[in-house]
Amino acid sequence: MQQYLDLMKHILAEGVDKSDRTGTGTRSVFGYQMRFDLSKGFPLVTTKKCHMRSIIHELLWFLKGETNIAYLRENKVSIWDEWADDNGDLGPVYGAQWRSWPTQSGDAIDQISQVIAQIKAQPDSRRLIVSAWNVGELDKMALAPCHAFFQFYVADGKLSCQLYQRSCDVFLGLPFNIASYALLTMMVAQQCDLALGDFVWTGGDTHLYSNHMEQTVLQLSREPKPLPLMTILRKPESIFDYQFEDFELTNYNPHPHIKAPVAV
């Protein structure tokens, strides 16, 4: 994951200091892209230990269309706790937009089912897109979507995915985002009987928080290790039938975890 370390170096060297919604302060660049060949290993950061269990459960939670953190809490995942209300609700965040985007007629669009059907029927379509950025519902969300928009691309029997992330917490959030969308691409590829292509990550406001600088320097002092392997152990009937036990991560030997505060 040298690409990830190179991004950190780029922000430290070329970034500008900015204020932000949380009041923490950031060093930021605008517009950055990384590409990961998914056939060459699973892109999970190795210069610190990442909690893959949380990443998998969060993705399954998105795919369920849920917006209450009860499922996450049941599985000891706390990454959304700071934003939930007293009942555990987050408003119409990712899961709602992915699975039930509201229409003017009062119906809802299941974007995940729709895009998989499109990939199977029209793999050369340039409309293989899922969006979480629903302008009409942003004010109802506990947190506006950071990873806002993704597009699939099929060529030579391989499935690739590009994510546009409008706002990116590089130290804490980005390793989760890369791994999550890489895994989603693997799942969709399996459902569509396609081989793996690339995961392309594109960032808008791409930043390091001012209280993550010491941790960033520590991480940059570490040498990346070989990428792990992610295996999907079975092919369920649909994208919505995967269980946590269907995923096996092997050969992951990261450097120790680095603790850092979350900017809320």
From Swiss-Prot:
The gene is thyA. GO terms for cellular component: cytosol. The keyword Lipid metabolism does not apply. It holds the Pfam family Thymidylat_synt. Pathway: Pyrimidine metabolism; dTTP biosynthesis. DUMP binds at R21, R126, R127, R166, S167, C168, D169, N177, H207, L208, Y209. It comes from the Bacteria. The active site is at C146. The keyword Cytoplasm applies. Its EC number is 2.1.1.45. This is Thymidylate synthase. Homodimer. It catalyses: dUMP + (6R)-5,10-methylene-5,6,7,8-tetrahydrofolate = 7,8-dihydrofolate + dTMP. Catalyzes the reductive methylation of 2'-deoxyuridine-5'-monophosphate (dUMP) to 2'-deoxythymidine-5'-monophosphate (dTMP) while utilizing 5,10-methylenetetrahydrofolate (mTHF) as the methyl donor and reductant in the reaction, yielding dihydrofolate (DHF) as a by-product. This enzymatic reaction provides an intracellular de novo source of dTMP, an essential precursor for DNA biosynthesis. One of its GO terms (molecular function) is thymidylate synthase activity. It comes from Shewanella sp. (strain W3-18-1). Belongs to the thymidylate synthase family. Bacterial-type ThyA subfamily. InterPro entries: Thymidate_synth/dCMP_Mease (IPR045097), Thymidate_synth/dCMP_Mease_dom (IPR023451), Thymidate_synth/dCMP_Mease_sf (IPR036926), Thymidylate_synthase (IPR000398), Thymidylate_synthase_AS (IPR020940). It is found in: Cytoplasm. (6R)-5,10-methylene-5,6,7,8-tetrahydrofolate binds at H51, D169, A263.
